[in-house]
């Protein structure tokens, strides 16, 4: 994993940053998810392929569980520095693995309590529901992620029956967040350190705007080391690394 990927993951693992991204992009800036309602989930899932019965490891960037009023839902933030042409299928893999994990836990609970469904072919009781799994793909690139945005964008259909087949295939759209093109209204909704990253991305290709951004912005950072790690990795500018080392040295003396 590259330095940029690690820096992106490192910042997003902070719950205040994670919840901020979710609130802005899922709930229109409404503070629905709080940091205290989040708990970190494993970034690796072990799955067994039906085709050959072999175990496989599935990697997710930053997954967390949100618990509200005894109801859970799962959120995963996927970082992409450029378009990935298989992302709809990758996301299907994430979702399948997470839902199957819940099914396995529910069936194990039924086994322990003897509360089996009738008939057994149901596998779960009618009252047993799964927690939603939502993936947000964060596009850090300056280019808009246009396609693929759903499974159908990846498929090639026979011309004579394409329309008929399309109706029977779930589209499985993915949630792409093009950070560099977010509106001023959206950017103003960010409350965490992530707002500085989005503003940086919005003016990265305009040297004049970028210089002005650094000159007039008063950075009030909750996670300065993580932010500077990200900036250093993205710009390949050692000065940000030096600034981080100075912060760490100052904190050590304090």
Language model regions located:
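Elongated, amphipathic alpha-helical interaction scaffolds
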Residues: 1-254
């Amino acid at each position: 994993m590259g330095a940029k990927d690690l820096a992106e993951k490192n910042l997003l693992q902070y719950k205040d940053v994670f919840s901020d991204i979710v609130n802005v992009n899922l709930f229109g800036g409404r503070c629905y998810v709080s940091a205290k309602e989040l708990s970190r989930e494993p970034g690796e899932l072990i799955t067994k392929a039906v085709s050959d019965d072999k175990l496989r490891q599935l990697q997710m960037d930053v997954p967390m569980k949100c618990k509200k009023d005894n109801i859970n839902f799962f959120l995963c933030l996927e970082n992409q520095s450029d378009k990935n042409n298989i992302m709809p299928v990758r996301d299907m893999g994430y979702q399948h693995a997470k839902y199957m994990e819940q099914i396995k836990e529910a069936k194990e609970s039924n086994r322990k309590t003897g509360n089996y469904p009738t008939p057994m072919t149901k596998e779960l009781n009618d009252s047993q529901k799964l927690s939603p799994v939502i993936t947000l793909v964060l596009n850090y690139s300056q280019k808009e992620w246009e396609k693929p945005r759903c499974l159908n964008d990846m498929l090639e259909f026979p011309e004579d029956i394409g329309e008929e087949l399309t109706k029977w295939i779930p589209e499985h759209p993915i949630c792409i967040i093009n950070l560099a093109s977010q509106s001023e209204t959206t950017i103003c909704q960010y409350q965490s350190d992530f707002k500085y990253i989005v503003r940086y991305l919005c003016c990265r290709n305009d040297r004049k705007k970028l210089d002005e951004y650094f000159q007039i912005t008063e950075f009030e950072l909750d996670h300065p080391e993580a932010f500077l790690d990200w900036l250093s990795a993205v710009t390949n500018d050692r000065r940000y690394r030096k600034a981080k080392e100075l912060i760490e040295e100052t904190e050590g003396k304090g």
